Amino acid sequence: MAHVSSETQDVSPKDELTASEASTRSPLCEHTFPGDSDLRSMIEEHAFQVLSQGSLLESPSYTVCVSEPDKDDDFLSLNFPRKLWKIVESDQFKSISWDENGTCIVINEELFKKEILETKAPYRIFQTDAIKSFVRQLNLYGFSKIQQNFQRSAFLATFLSEEKESSVLSKLKFYYNPNFKRGYPQLLVRVKRRIGVKNASPISTLFNEDFNKKHFRAGANMENHNSALAAEASEESLFSASKNLNMPLTRESSVRQIIANSSVPIRSGFPPPSPSTSVGPSEQIATDQHAILNQLTTIHMHSHSTYMQARGHIVNFITTTTSQYHIISPLQNGYFGLTVEPSAVPTRYPLVSVNEAPYRNMLPAGNPWLQMPTIADRSAAPHSRLALQPSPLDKYHPNYN
């Protein structure tokens, strides 16, 4: 008995704890099986994973809240329309906002300058710090300023209140762009910067200069073409008029052939042209016809003051001066056809004064005259018989019988 009691006294406190734990676990171990231990370990691992995921979810929520202001302050990477859109949509800025309809932006210029434009880096939004430069940027991107009309009432109290409101509203500026509207950020793609005149490419300016030069040359060619057509039309009209008056235009060969046959001197009332000029019939008729008709007064024949007239035909008279020939017809109400050609026959009579001229009493006073050989155009009436008949102008002559 003494030996047993000594063994019980030698038991340490640790042994007592292990014995107590074994006594407490013994009921549980009695009801557990080997497969239940595996299930228990899986449950413990799952609970540990849930706790670890919960701790991880709480920490990113704090980091996201810290990083959002950094994204909002990153205005340097945005263009002007998107910067403007962002500050209008933000509640942080009080100097700029939408109007009631959301179609215009309202800017308090004084407050806008202090709140946004005068901010320093790294919080600067726009590159400029002047309100005029900012308004110029708005105009370049298609924003237009809208004037607000204030209606005043006749009552004093309401008038004063409206006056205060108008003074406040006068500080506000309204700007409109059809592609800048509240709730339509997709329209910002259409808000583009306008290209100024100074930034135009030199290729376009060279193209415009070449186009103007070509247009000027084309216009000059058209004017020359029109003048040529007008000259041809005038020649055709004169030629048709001469045909209607039975006055054919005489060529150089026919004139020289007729002059070689015979010559009769007559007097002419217009001065001779310069010897150096040689003009064709079609070119000289249009310019000299009116001057010759104004200068000619009368034409007298050398033989007994009579005029020659063909019966039923027109007789063309060729008069020669010192250097040129003139085809003159006294018929058709004083119409004279004129052809100027170089002279091939020497002058029969030189230039004579009025006092020395024969039959000077037959000439009007102050009318110079000169001797010119005259030949009837036989080609115009080859078979006609000429007859001397008194002219109706002889009735007014003092020597008329």
UniProtKB/Swiss-Prot annotation:
Tissues expressed in: Testis-specific. Present in Sertoli cells and spermatogenic cells (at protein level).
Keywords: Cytoplasm, DNA-binding, Nucleus, Transcription, Transcription regulation
Membrane-spanning intervals of the chain: none
GO cellular component: chromatin; cytosol; nucleoplasm
Segments of the chain annotated as binding DNA: 76-194
Pfam family, one: HSF_DNA-bind
Keyword ATP-binding: no
Biased composition regions of type Polar residues, renumbered to the chain: 1-11
InterPro entries: HSF_DNA-bd, WH-like_DNA-bd_sf, WH_DNA-bd_sf
Subcellular location: Nucleus; Cytoplasm
GO MF: DNA-binding transcription factor activity, RNA polymerase II-specific; sequence-specific double-stranded DNA binding
Chain intervals for the UniProt region annotation (Disordered): 1-30
Family: Belongs to the HSF family.
Entry protein name: Heat shock transcription factor, Y-linked
Annotated gene: HSFY1
